[in-house]
């Protein structure tokens, strides 16, 4: 089963037009922490990325590579992965002292659930930092032992 999954993942990655080295590095780091990164349409319609905390699966919509936002999308989902680790399997905020850029606000303000809005605010805050990759990696290492 896992050999088939790995082969399918490699096949999908080979079809992606030159995924960034940072994307592949982050994908490997997530997988070493027990997350499964799947390049396929997420179960939630219209999502670019999705983390299902129950089984630590992360879907990345293949369209993000055509849009040039593959790494940014995985950075966002990496923050959610760190949130799951921090909550010991239940997603929780990390208490970060950074704010998202103004252009990102509409992407999380539409959530009516305050907890979900806070979780998304943190993910967008990290995603929009100039050092977003390094910040996401440090959060993953800090919270996912």
State each model region's role:
Residues 44-53:
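Post-signal-peptide N-terminal segment of Sec-exported extracytoplasmic proteins
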Residues 74-78, 118:
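Alpha-helical architecture
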Residues 78-95:
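Catalytic Zn2+-binding segment of zinc metalloproteases
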Residues 53-60, 105-107:
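Acidic/histidine-rich, surface-exposed loop or edge segments in extracytoplasmic proteins
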Residues 18-45, 91-145:
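Metalloprotease/metallohydrolase-associated module, dominated by Zn2+-dependent proteases
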Residues 4-12:
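Sec-dependent N-terminal signal peptides
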